[in-house]
């Protein structure tokens, strides 16, 4: 790796700050992080670790709507924040097994009116959806991270209370 031009890096950082960091900002369109979803290779082992070892209460277990037989389960991280997991029984991950324990997606809660407006903005920007259900849109950010905009209140999932 070659030497970094730290002066140029700092100048670029300052240019971006000047262009985008405003002294007075509007309120965010988001209500908060609904949940961050990780992958689990063993549901019970994951529950024993996060609830038993770390003290994060298990709040709900439901079937993953996107993969029949998969469990979607949630832990309370406090302040309305959820940590979620998926398992994918029967799915041969093969060379992708290393993603176990990795990020599946980041779910951001927005109200339904804002959700529709953000959907229009995604459409206008030419962003392709990985999935869309009428209250949930999955898409990739510019670096490939999977993001979900979810028109569900914090602590609810598919109309069920999960917190």
Model regions: which residues?
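Core segments of cupin and vicinal oxygen chelate
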Residues: 39-82
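N-terminal beta-strand motif that seeds the catalytic metal site of vicinal oxygen chelate
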Residues: 2-44, 103-106, 110, 159-163
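Short, charged/polar, Gly/Pro-enriched secondary-structure boundary elements
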Residues: 80-83, 144-148
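A short acidic/small-residue loop/turn micro-motif
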Residues: 90, 153-156
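A short, acidic/glycine-rich surface segment
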Residues: 20-22, 60, 69, 90-95
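Vicinal oxygen chelate
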Residues: 42-44, 101-146, 153-154
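Helix-adjacent hinge/juxtasegments
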Residues: 82-88, 92-109
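Short, well-ordered beta-strand micro-motif
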Residues: 76, 87, 138-140
